Amino acid sequence: LTSVWRARGLKPVFLAMICAFGAWALLLPVVPTAVLDAGGSETLAGLTTGVFMLFTVVTQIFTPMLLRKVGYTTVLSVSAFLLGFPAVGYLLGMSAPAVLTVSAIRGVGFGALTVAEAAIVAELVPIRLLGRATGLVGIMIGLAQMIALPAGMALVQRIGYDAVYLIAGGIGLLALVACQGIPPIPPPTEKSSETDHIHVPMWRLVLVPALALMFVTTAYGAITNFLPASMRELDAATGATLGGLMLGLMNFASMLSRYYAGRVMDKVGQPGTVMIRFQIISALGVFVMAGILFLDLPVWWMALAALLYGTGFGAVQNEALTMMFYRLPRSKTSEAAAIWNIAYDGGTGMGSTFYGMLLTTVAFAPMFGIASGVIVLGLVVTLLDRQLGRHRVVEVNNLAARLQSVQAPRRYNRGGKKRSGGQ
């Protein structure tokens, strides 16, 4: 296998990803804005995403166990339904019980779907193409978010909130249809060979990439929830719509940089080589957002900030995911996917909730300034980890060891002979 696109069953997986993240991203800025327009508080607006992400994260903790018990097909199908259909429940109103209940149900579906989709990519693709495959995952997700994030607010202006809720529900159900085209994958086995039983706590192996990702995504929670509202202070007429456009631009940059990081990983042979520089870029982007709002600069300056943050955000995502696959044993693929998603969604949820509460006491500019500082904390953790050394990998039956086993024959024989290393 020489092309990611030829991997069996990968195209339906990509389609399901596009639909799932499209349904999520379409409502990500819409629901908090709807709460505010209905007279709700900033705290409730932030909690709509916070509760969604809380139930997402809790579900992600148990998803590896579900995959072992019932397999990928069942988990993917049920989770796609739970993400899609309940979106129509927002038609019941923006009261706290109604909106938080719907958000919780959809969070369960989103949590299981994201873990299963990430893990199944590692099952379908040979390890020598894993960096590129995870980069393509970023492109699929980025395309969905680039279209859906600005489309949500734009559609609200034209057809109203209720119609957008129905559209989101329909897109989520399309993910259910796409899941039916994914080939059966044997559930991950609970037992592994004796060589896997190296008693190194899992948290030691994944803590640094998880923290790096989580600190970056706290800013993502703030940006997706409050950037449109903050831009209304710069331009009352078009600020919210332009805010949605900036979210799309941010995800376009994220999509490209995530694929770039994947290609670098395949070329170098190990992940993490570009993590630090892109953490710096993401922190700079959020700091620029704070500066634009503080100085009351023209609204189009926000495009620069969105590009900077998106570029850093995308590469950090891919570096964190491949670092987890690289460090954990092969039998822990679903756990690696779960931890990555927990860090991503947990950071987003904590960011939206914390910064929503923070906005009750400070303005948008200092809020984004604090978000930039939180990213710097993740940068410090990564720098300390690199300074302390790289001896945190279980070098038995994990991606690092398997890559070494295929890279030596590739260097020795560059002819057309078939080489081992696929899955």
Question: Where are the regions a protein language model picked out?
Answer:
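Cytoplasmic helix-loop-helix junction between adjacent transmembrane helices
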Residues: 104-139
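C-terminal transmembrane helical hairpin of 12-TM major facilitator-type secondary transporters
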Residues: 272-320
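Residue-level signature of mid-helix packing/kink "hotspots" within the transmembrane helices
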Residues: 53-61, 145-146, 251-255, 259, ...
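Juxtamembrane intracellular "pre-TM" segments in multi-pass secondary transporters
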Residues: 1-7, 184-209, 399-416
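Short amphipathic helix-loop junctions that connect adjacent transmembrane helices
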Residues: 30-42, 225-241
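Helix-to-loop junctions at the C-terminal end of transmembrane segments
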Residues: 59-71, 257-270
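Core transmembrane helices of Major Facilitator Superfamily
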Residues: 24, 105-117, 308-320
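Cytoplasmic membrane-interface "Motif A"-like loop-to-helix N-cap segments
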Residues: 69-79, 267-280
